[in-house]
């Protein structure tokens, strides 16, 4: 075989999926092992075996972990079969190894080639060899350091079966030549520009140029590609569309992701087939177009962080994910949620909404996330929402809510799936019953990993791309106001701060094992800090400042290994601050305003003499134990003595009653 130049690829791992020509049972597994021989070869055709062996020998395996299959070459029939590859074809994925480009000459049936991060050096010798891969359909060269220009005579443009091409995150210096149009079977391409040559790619289904610095306007011709169903341009600097706002209407696009750009002006009219539209973090203005109500397949509408005005749309009942957060919307939340509504997320926080919560929300049996924080809603606590069986997040903070938050019967609150309840900065009053947190079954379970509230799947022949739309809330956490994402099943949090609540803090708070943040500050709570807080092993943030709490700080809090923030300042607490790393490492301000508190991190010492508080505590315990032992000794002597005394008296009374008369006297005996 003719030897070509030896410019190398440095690869993370190499996996070779080989389908031998005999039958599905003839798939092979080849692994690098200590003695450098093969294991598991099965009925492979001789020329296939020779090609595979030669390809394996191109690699430097001296630094491989030979016990790890992914540091070698392997073949997996299940993966080949699941990809529906035709017999006689091969798929290769390369990373962090060294291979001469001549290797690819032997694989005329290669259909998939991937060389991804960590970055590879410039590889001018790779492209000439590509013309030998006549059946190649997938080529992923993303996240490398390829440089230079793509010349018109590049063998890349001879891959007429190519359907998937990814060249993103490289250092190519040229624009795409017109020869790019020869790839007329291309369906998916990730680049850093919108080349005009794309006009000729009539089979293009998905374009993803996200996370780049592309500016300007989206070309009008893009929407005329007949099979295009996904456009992802998030995290760029686009500022508008060529043509009118009606340019998208007749497009076949189903998923349109415009988030985090510089778009201005009115929202575009959406395609009739749209499933998901995300345009958050832009500068869109005007009202939400009425045409949205005619897009019956719309499942995701994400318009957060814009400057939209006007009312909330009347037709959102069957949109699964609705995020209108941080706009300038006015009016009331419409009473138009119908029975059987499919809405799962409704976030209208940080607007100018007034009125009351719509009672038609009771029709939304799938509702999991409801956020109306930072508006001007004036209403009582929505106990009626307990009828929603899946409600997990409820945020009412910074509105004009008022009245009690305990049910009239003073029992448990009654939201079994609730994990996050934020009602801070309102005018809620009254006390919490001792059983208030008993029915929070979801928060009483241990933490689970969040898998995304609403996901859109974009399927293609090369895998499944998942776009996840996360819920976000503003939570005062560890003393800071922070925007939290991944909120649903990943943790539990309670924020009752800045209200007019009073009475004792219920011991039932200790049942919420998934609780990571508890904020009861700026109320009028009295009584002791619940000892049951020591049961909250996941707790990371605890704020009970500016109340009227008394007594001591529970010693069990020092055992909470995740507790990163605690504040009990400005109460009426006394005694020694528990001495544990998580507590003594806090700022002094977390404990100030309690005249009776002493010990680190405060400067006030708890004792005047040289003995430490711990030593005094031990001495007190020893004295108590000594007294208990003395009483035990007395009891041990008293019990048997009393028994013997009764026995002697019984014998005397039975057999010698005159002796008993002499001992106690006749008068005493008559009594």
From Swiss-Prot:
Name the glycosylated positions. 65, 96, 132, 153, 171, 235, 250, 283, 318, 363, 519
Q: Where is this gene product found? A: Cell membrane
Look up the record and report any one GO term of the cellular component aspect: plasma membrane
Each LRR repeat occupies one of these ranges, namely 107-129, 133-159, 160-182, 184-200, 201-225, 228-250, 251-276, 277-294, 295-316, 317-340, 341-364, 366-387, 388-412, 415-439, 489-512, 513-536, 537-560, 562-585
Q: Which domain of life is it from?
A: Eukaryota
Which stretch is the leader sequence?
1-27
| Membrane spanning residue stretches | 633-653
Keywords of the record, alphabetical order, are: Cell membrane, Glycoprotein, Leucine-rich repeat, Membrane, Receptor, Repeat, Signal, Transmembrane, Transmembrane helix
Q: State the Gene3D superfamilies in the record.
A: Ribonuclease Inhibitor
Which regions of this chain are Cytoplasmic-facing, per the record's topological domains?
A: 654-671
Topological domain, Extracellular: which ranges? 28-632
Q: How does it sit in the membrane?
A: Single-pass type I membrane protein
Q: What's the protein called, per UniProt?
A: Receptor-like protein 20
């Amino acid at each position: 075989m003719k030897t070509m130049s030896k410019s190398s690829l440095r690869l993370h791992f190499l996996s070779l999926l080989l389908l031998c020509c005999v039958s599905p049972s003839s798939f092979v597994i080849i692994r690098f092992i200590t003695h450098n021989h093969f294991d598991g070869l099965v009925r492979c055709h001789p020329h296939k075996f020779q090609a595979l062996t030669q390809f394996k020998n191109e690699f430097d395996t001296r630094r491989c972990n030979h016990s790890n299959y992914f540091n070698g070459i392997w073949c997996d029939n299940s993966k080949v079969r699941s990809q529906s590859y035709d017999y006689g074809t091969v798929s290769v994925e390369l990373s962090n190894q060294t291979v001469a480009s001549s290797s690819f000459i032997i694989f005329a049936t290669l259909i998939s080639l991937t060389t991804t991060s960590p970055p590879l050096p410039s590889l001018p010798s790779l492209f000439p060899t590509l013309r030998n891969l006549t059946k190649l359909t997938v080529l992923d060269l993303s996240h490398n350091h390829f440089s230079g220009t793509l010349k018109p005579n590049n063998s890349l443009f001879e891959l007429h079966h190519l359907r998937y091409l990814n060249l993103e995150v490289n250092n190519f210096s040229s624009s795409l030549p017109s020869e790019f149009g020869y790839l007329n079977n291309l369906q998916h391409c990730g680049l850093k520009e919108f080349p005009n040559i794309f006009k000729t790619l009539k089979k293009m289904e998905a374009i993803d140029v996200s996370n780049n610095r592309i500016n300007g306007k989206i070309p009008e011709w893009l929407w005329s590609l007949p099979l295009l169903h996904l456009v992802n341009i998030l995290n760029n600097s686009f500022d508008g569309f060529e043509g009118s706002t009606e340019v998208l209407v007749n497009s076949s696009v189903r998923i349109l992701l415009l988030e985090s750009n510089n778009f201005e002006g009115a929202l575009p009219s959406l395609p009739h087939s749209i499933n998901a539209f995300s345009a958050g973090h832009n500068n869109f203005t005007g009202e939400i177009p009425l045409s949205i109500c005619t897009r019956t397949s719309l499942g995701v509408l994400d318009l957060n962080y814009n400057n939209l005005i006007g009312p909330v749309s009347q037709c959102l009942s069957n949109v699964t994910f609705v995020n209108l957060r941080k706009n300038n919307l006015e009016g009331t939340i419409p009473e138009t949620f119908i029975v059987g509504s499919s809405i799962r997320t409704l976030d209208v926080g940080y607007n100018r909404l007034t009125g009351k919560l719509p009672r038609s929300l009771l029709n939304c049996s799938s509702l999991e996330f409801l956020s109306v924080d930072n508006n001007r809603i004036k209403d009582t606590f929505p106990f009626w929402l307990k009828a929603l069986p899946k409600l997990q997040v409820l945020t009412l903070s910074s509105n004009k809510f008022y009245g009690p938050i305990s049910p009239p019967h003073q029992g448990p609150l009654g939201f079994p799936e609730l994990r996050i309840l934020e009602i801070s900065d309102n005018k809620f009053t009254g006390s919490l019953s001792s059983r208030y947190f008993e029915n929070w079954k979801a928060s009483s379970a241990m933490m689970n990993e969040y898998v995304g509230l609403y996901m859109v799947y974009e399927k293609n022949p090369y895998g499944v791309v998942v776009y996840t739309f996360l819920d976000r809330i503003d939570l005062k956490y560890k003393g800071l106001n922070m925007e939290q994402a991944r909120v649903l099943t990943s943790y539990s949090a309670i924020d009752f701060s800045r209200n007019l609540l009073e009475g004792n803090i219920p011991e039932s708070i200790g049942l919420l094992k998934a609780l990571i943040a508890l904020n009861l500050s700026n109320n009028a709570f009295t009584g002791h800090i619940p000892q049951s807080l020591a049961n909250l092993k996941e707790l990371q943030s605890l704020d009970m400042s500016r109340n009227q709490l008394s007594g001591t700080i529970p010693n069990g809090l020092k055992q909470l290994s995740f507790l990163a923030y605690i504040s009990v300042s400005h109460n009426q607490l006394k005694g020694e601050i528990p001495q544990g790393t998580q507590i003594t490492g806090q700022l002094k301000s977390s404990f100030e305003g309690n005249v009776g508190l002493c010990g680190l991190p405060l400067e006030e010492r708890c004792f005047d003499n040289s003995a430490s508080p711990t030593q005094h505590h031990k001495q007190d315990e020893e004295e108590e134990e000594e007294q208990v032992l003395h009483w035990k000794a007395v009891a041990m002597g008293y019990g048997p003595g009393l028994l013997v005394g009764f026995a002697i008296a019984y014998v005397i009374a039975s057999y010698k009653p005159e002796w008993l008369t002499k001992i106690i006297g006749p008068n005493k005996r008559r009594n």
